[in-house]
Amino acid sequence: KIPKKQVKLDVSFKELSDVHEINIEKCVSYYIECDKENYHLGKIIGMGVYDGDNLFYVSPEKVKEVCEYLKQAVTYTYDLKKNMVLLKDVNMISNFDHMIGAYLLNYQMKDDLAFMMNNDGIEAPFYSDILKDEEMLKKGVTLKAKYVYDTRDDIVKRLKMDDMFDLFTNVEMPLVRVLAKMELAGIRCDKDILKEMSEEAGVRLDNLSREIYNYAGCEFNVSSPKQLGNILFDHLGLPYRKKKKDGANYSTDASILEGLIGVHPIIELILEYRNLAKLKSTYLDGLNNYILDDGRIHTIYKQTLTRTGRLSSAEPNLQNIPARDEMDRKVRRAFVPEYDLFLSADYSQIELRVLAHISNSEKMIEAFKNNEDIHTRVASDIFGVSPEEVTKSMRRTAKAVIFGIVYGISGFGLGENLKINPSDAKKFIEKYLELYP
């Protein structure tokens, strides 16, 4: 709920001069601010500390001393992982991360605590404002430190009411520390390999451009949807299979172009150009910007972003390194192990095992107990063929159906994913639910 009226809190604080001013006999909350959203590239610019009675602002040069002192206390904070990275040589561990608790109660929360505070009626400065003004910074970090302290008991109470306190304590909080160590370790990435591949991609893009211009009969900006649309549908007269409003530009998204494959040889060249241009800008050139002085990429693992509880990755997204074709797979050569080996570990169909357990589906449980490939088993049942007769296409369809159902997909959404009629997709869903009630 957003209150009709916000409350301006006149919270007085003092600037800390001696760490012993903080009473560590009771619980202490703290909030640390960084000058960049990507905290791997940033530095600490201030800290707020609240001991239940007194509120302090801590200047950047005293933050590590204060954190060493606070190791003796029971502490609460917000975004412990960020703090652990910023305080890497302090090894600061807190007992309660407000960010994790709030996420479990509401997955739609935002990273900036000010959003939650303003929703609660507390007029707190947002991160963008804090960076502009020192007094705003001091107000922000102290207000946030006090808010973490004041709301901690309520969050714990609500977690217990929702039967999530055990998840919070025994899974999510230990995971924070694991992810912090992973982020600090980073992954080695070879700039020379990226540079070599970028140059190779640049040559191929130049050649593709010339071939495209040759078919078009003129030069134009291949990366401009407007110019490309005019070339394809006005100049070359290719069929446009979508209703176009007067004055609007032609759509040249992937679905439109893929529908024209085989109609004109320029289409395959444009699709290749697009894929290669994205590969070059996002990965071959883009990853270079994230390689720090230690030769490593330090991504940020987002523990509080997805609705499903999955981890995500940002700055850069290391979970989305392409692997569709040979050129894509070459990008992965740039990631080099420290000791000649990368270990890949993965749960075997963990989501579907959980689904089988919760739904008590006899067929799924039987398939897992027999160590069957669950997607092949489902494809066999849906298409009415033996497991040996299941094709790659059938298995791919079954996999899309299963995961689609797990995450609440509609017939329309599944149809789009599989590029089939929504009514046919709906029948797949109904057939699955009939076979695996």
Residue positions per predicted region:
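Short, solvent-exposed amphipathic alpha-helical segments in soluble enzyme
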Residues: 44-46, 90-91, 358-361
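Short hydrophobic/aromatic-enriched beta-strand-loop microsegments
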Residues: 92-99, 425
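Function-dense linear segments that define catalytic or interfacial modules
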Residues: 50-53, 99-128, 140-142, 147, ...
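A short acidic (Asp/Glu
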Residues: 40-43, 85-89, 354
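Short helix/loop segment immediately N-terminal to the Walker
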Residues: 160, 167, 386-394
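Amphipathic, charged-and-aliphatic alpha-helical interface segments
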Residues: 390-408
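Conserved "right-hand" nucleotidyltransferase catalytic core of DNA-directed polymerases
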Residues: 1-61, 71-80, 134-327, 336-341, ...
